[in-house]
Structures are given as structure tokens and as C-alpha cells.
Amino acid sequence: MSQIGINDGASQQPAGTTLGGVAARLGKVAVLMGGASAEREVSLMSGQGVLQALISQGVDAHAFDPAERDLAELKVEGFSHCFIALHGRFGEDGTVQGALELLGIPYTGSGVMASSIAIDKVMTKRIWRSEGLPTPEWRQVDSAAATSEAFAALGSPMIVKPDREGSTIGLTKVTQIEQCGAAYALAARHDAMVLCEQFVKGDEVTIPLLGSGAGAHALPVIRIVAPDGNYDYQNKYFTDTTQYLVPANLPAGEEAHIQQLALKAYQVLGCRGWARVDVMIDARTRAPFLLEINTSPGMTPHSLVPMAAKAAGVSYPALCLEVLRHATLDYAAAGGDAQQPSTEPA
């Protein structure tokens, strides 16, 4: 399942041949970074990494912060493609994707509908459940009292988090009913919709995915070992104490099964281009449970998609170019025909 199908242009292609052709076809590229979400700081780190990687591959790439500039300027300034390195709301929730559809500028990652569904954890879980895919039990709550009721139903520990945030922002692991009020208040500061989810004790893994349709495939599974099991915002991005194990050293046959599960989770939501699926493996039964999907994954020095790609022999610059090569639109600006990614190797 971890076949790649990417040429590492940085090491395999002579200057001025295939890479030059790809860069010329892509034209002027905007790397969208920053934005107005709670994940702005991480987005800026991702965007700067992507920007420098694309430039190193000969792409005419430029930084563009939608929090500081109007998206309409993309058309005025002649940008022909966008690499979306935005995270969270107003970046990976379908809003920017919809604007780029109207502007007729192909962009990386999932389209409008898949993006808007995937950022909504409750809606995502409902779809996965309807498709027979395993995900932890949950309750959607709108008050501290409802959070306490969810705790009584789901048991301890319970995860309380905003429905439409990422990077563990606003998340609390609740072990006593007295913590429910504060946990709800923290999550509700970030979103009016709050999710209470049954905690699964076991191995935390993540599975990056690349490609679209029948060409989509999983990269190697990464197992995450955080200090005291606390994979929070700080441990994700700003410390070196979290261990990332790739190969994940899972029992025989388990990695392939989890890759297939992640691929199915990606496909039933209609995702394309790339994403990352987070999974918990029950310590007792070894059953995997889908947690959530990220349709605009981080590309920082601590990020997981570049880590999995590297384990598969793909450099960071080649990964960025491959993601950009799949930039497309739901519908063309005129005529209504869906644009397809180039079949030219990156």
C-alpha cells in the first residue's frame, strides 16, 4: 500500500529537463499561508517550507497571506495555481476552495464539499459510521450539562474538543465529571459545536495519503509516542520529546490493514490530492478506530506527511511538487468540465 509513484526530481532529474517542463506548465504559483484561523502560526511555518521547496524545484512560487490580501488579487496578478498551506477554518473548510473555484485557479487538496465535510468531525464520523467504518462513540454537545451527560454515557477518559478545529487546539482529556464544565468552556471558545468522544487507549498512528480516485495510495504508517501520551499542540510543533516511529513496527499484517482503512476513509469523503488520517489502535483488541482526517496537512519540520514520504524515499521538495502537480478545480471556470491533474511525472 505504500507505493509512491513520485520521481524525486531533486536527485533524479537533470536540470532543465522534466523539472523545467513541470515548472513551466505550473506557471506562477501562490503558496497560501497564514490566514485567520487559530492555526495561523503553524500555517506560516508550513507555507515557508513549501515556498522554499518549490523555488528549489524551479517553480515561480510566491507567498500569499489571505489575512493580509484579498484573494481577488490572485487573478489580477496572474497566478495560475495555488498551493494551499492554510490550516483550520477559512483555509481547509471549503471557503478558500470555493473562492478559488470562482476565480478559476486550480488548487491543491480536496474540493469544496470534501473540505467542508472533513473539517467537521461530527459530520465526518457520521459518514464513516454510515459506511461501516469504525470510529469511537461520540456525542455532540452544546452545554456543560450535556458534556456531563456525555461523560456518564461514554465513560472515562473522554475527549472533549471543538468540532471544527485542528492541531489539538481546545482539546481536553476528561477523567472526572467535575472537569466537564471547564473542558466544554475551553472547546466552546473555539467553536459553538463541541464533540465529546470516547477515548481509545492504545497506539496512536497516522497515515498520509496521496493522489486521487483509483490512483490514491497510502504512505508508510507513523506511530506517535508522546510524553505521557499527551500529543498536544506544544508537543506537536515545538518540542523534540515526541517520538515518531516509521516504520511503525506494528504486528504482522496490521499496517496494511490500517492503510486500507485510511484509504477507504479518504475516498468515502470524496477527498483528493492529499490528506492525513489519524487512527487509534485499541491496546486490548488491536481494533483500529478512525479519529479524524486532515485535508491540508502540516508541512513544518515536525510534520508527519514529509516524515512518511522521506521514509518512502521521497524528498520534501519532490513531495511538494507532487502535491502541486495534482492541483485542480471541481469545475472549470467555463464549460463545467472538471480539470484533471497532469500525467507528466514530477
UniProtKB/Swiss-Prot annotation:
> Under which pathway is this protein filed?
Cell wall biogenesis; peptidoglycan biosynthesis
Identify the InterPro entries for this entry. Answer: ATP-grasp, ATP_grasp_subdomain_1, D-Ala_lig_Van_CS, D_ala_D_ala, Dala_Dala_lig_C, Dala_Dala_lig_N, PreATP-grasp_dom_sf
Cellular component aspect of the GO annotation: cytosol
Supply the EC number(s).
6.3.2.4
Question: Which Pfam family, just one, is annotated for this protein?
Answer: Dala_Dala_lig_C
Q: Sorted alphabetically, which keywords does the UniProt record give?
A: ATP-binding, Cell shape, Cell wall biogenesis/degradation, Cytoplasm, Ligase, Magnesium, Manganese, Metal-binding, Nucleotide-binding, Peptidoglycan synthesis
Q: One GO molecular function term?
A: metal ion binding
PROSITE patterns xrefs: ATP_GRASP (PS50975), DALA_DALA_LIGASE_1 (PS00843), DALA_DALA_LIGASE_2 (PS00844)
Q: Where does it reside? A: Cytoplasm
Entry binding sites for Mg(2+) 2: 292, 294
Domain named ATP-grasp: which ranges?
125-325
Q: Where does Mg(2+) 1 bind?
A: 278, 292
Record field: catalytic activity: 2 D-alanine + ATP = D-alanyl-D-alanine + ADP + phosphate + H(+)
Q: Which GO terms describe its biological process?
A: cell wall organization; peptidoglycan biosynthetic process; regulation of cell shape
Q: Does the keyword Ribonucleoprotein apply?
A: no
Query: Major location, coarse class?
Result: cytoplasm
Q: What does this protein do?
A: Cell wall formation.
- HAMAP family in the cross-refs: Dala_Dala_lig (MF_00047)
Regarding protein family, the annotation reads: Belongs to the D-alanine--D-alanine ligase family.
* Annotated protein name in UniProt: D-alanine--D-alanine ligase
**Source species:** Albidiferax ferrireducens (strain ATCC BAA-621 / DSM 15236 / T118)
